[in-house]
Amino acid sequence: SKQFLQHIRQYNSAFQMTSFGCSEDRIPGWQPTFRVKGQIHHRIGSLLNEGNERPVYCQIYFIEDAQEQVRQRNSYFDNLNADVISDVQAVLHKQNRYVSAFKTAAEILSEQNTDDMNLILSATKRPHGTHERRFNIPCTSELGVLMPNDIFNNRDIILRTRSHGRPLQRINECHRAYDALQYPILFPTGSDGWSIDLKLLNPKTGDHSNKQMSAMQYYTFKLMHRDYFNPLLYSGRLLQQYVVDQFVKMETTRLLYLRLNQSSLRCESYDVLCDTLKNNASSNTVGRNIILPASFTGSPRWYHNKLQDSLAYIRKFGSPDLFITTTMNPQDPVVKNCIYTGQRPEDRPDIVCRVFQRHVQEMKKLMVNHSIFGKLSAWLYSIEYQKRGLPHAHWLLWLSRNDRIHPDSVDNIVCAEIPAKEKDAVLYELVTTCMIHGPCGKQFPNAPCMKDGKCSKGFPKPFCNDTTITDGYPTYKRRSP
């Protein structure tokens, strides 16, 4: 239903078995995307709540009365439908293998009347066969085991009967239950997610290879459109959270690899040398840092290399002639054709990014191969993401000597005027729908660009008969009507 999709993140939170810890990045006004700052971590507590504490997360599944479970879940959110909660709860109790494991554990604990038992969800116990594409769901006995002693793998999930003041346990990103415990709405049967034990398959024979399947390979597969129903692609805001969660997981595994392989990356001697030179310290007091190589996207050395590449162009060809920004249009016909009925572009970040990448390649072909701005001596571009989620690209172009733009020809190339509809109806439609800032101003005080009662971008711009440039910022030709 529309109400379910509108509040799908809240419905998932009502049934999730682990907590979702993050610092969400919010902006004033309308925010169609889910953004976080820093790390994401999933945590899980004890099987039973302490004393008079309210049951949370997996503890709610141990409540015997089904209606009391519904009441507890509904009490955390004001905008959920109790009938929908009851229906989803019934499905999970019937189909979800983790819920079945919890119910079995509750029966055993009730019979033995002890607080010394732990429910171990193994990280290394693998289901028979293959994964979700071919895997058979293992039975509950293969999923978890009640153990009285603390004998477990360091990646196992240990659910103690009661916490007795112990802190919440953080779920390892490589655990096969990482996704199923957090997203029961997306994985109602409790199917396994990615783990380091997964191997790639030979597409011709279907046999397992010796190569490990990376998190990126696994989640790329999960996000692709298939001939069968994929609940991920219909989950709207929950898909955004899922994609962000998995990207952070991929980055975490990459950082872990770099931390564990510093010696093979020849970082130790570099680290010690830098510490000694900067701090003028003795060898006994020098600490050890983790070196992120230039191959890690977003690291200081990666940025430094990109900057040096750009400066090399400037040293060779001088200042760039054109600075162009291309922004993704959420109303792009290709995007509308690819998304499902009832969806908005922000519901499918995968489609938006793929379409934008195609447009970037087409733009590159027009500028480099077809020389629409003139013959280029050099060019580069950078892709960024706006706060509201849409990607955009910044281009720097160096024109050849014969195609350089002179000051007296600028107004023939660019201006800030609305074209006449009678002369070019297509251009008029593009400019009026995609190239006009706002609305903002005193009548729209909650607009994202409004700061201290005025537009932070300087709109509306003053009328100008000719383009002028002050301190590197142009005021484009915009004649008074």
Which stretches of residues belong to each language-model region?
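Non-catalytic interaction regions
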Residues: 1-481
